[in-house]
Amino acid sequence: MHTPTRQDDLTTWLHYLGNIHVSAIDMGLERVLPVFRALALAKPAFVFTVAGTNGKGSTTATIASICQQAGYKVALYQSPHLISFNERIKIDGIEVDDHTLIEAFWQVEQIRQACGVSLSFFEFMTLAAFYCFAQQHCAVWVLEIGLGGRLDVVNIIDPDVAVITNVAIDHTDWLGATREQIAKEKAGIIRGDIPVIYGEFDMPISISQQLQSLQAKYYCYCLLYTSDAADERSSV
């Protein structure tokens, strides 16, 4: 397949990226690691990584907005998009333009070919997003996990805060058939000695065990609000 150039448009690049790997989903970090390392991207000052069955999009958007209002230059990575691919990659709330994306795609593709590895569409897109964020010197990165957590390409970067919104039965072909199995995959974003936030009260045992084994700095439950918020809220 012909490799697009910097002069090709975004549609051409997206078609190419959708056809260079044998499967749309291919869990694991082994193929991605050499490309990521060769990119040699500077680590941002602060990284939020958000996993969970539901609510990842609204959670990442809220975190990004708060950080931006606080005066930081904020990178936001989400998926999937609704209308335009560019929605997935934002800096200070503004979608990255086609030219910036194409340059990122071209840079990642040169390194991918040099490393001799194949990347899925999501893996390639994620590395391109990281390249955009690093080139724009974003201080805070807010990253949404695509699928699961432990083996998701987003998890290649160590977070400073890990957020798991909730855990429900979903994507059982990839994450496991039970809530505990799925939770164990999502718990893969947890690192030792960082804040971990879990967004529902019935925490799966596998997440609790991961917190204990890694001695995560602390964790808390999010506040729950109903129509009777004043009576229903529960503190950390």
Give residue ranges: language-model regions.
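Short functional linear segments
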Residues: M1-G52, T59, S65-A70, Y77, ...
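ATP-dependent carboxylate-amine ligase catalytic core
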Residues: I25, L29, L33-K43, Q69-I157, ...
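Conserved adenylation A10 loop of the ANL superfamily
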Residues: V50-G57, T165, T226
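Short glycine/serine/threonine-rich phosphate/pyrophosphate-binding segments
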Residues: S58-T62, G149-L151
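Aromatic/hydrophobic pocket-lining residues that form π-stacking "cages" and hydrophobic walls in ligand
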Residues: I63, A129, I207, L211, ...
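Conserved catalytic-core segment of NTP-binding enzymes
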Residues: G149-L151, D158-Q210, L214
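Conserved small/polar residues in nucleotide/adenosyl-binding loops
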Residues: Y225-E232
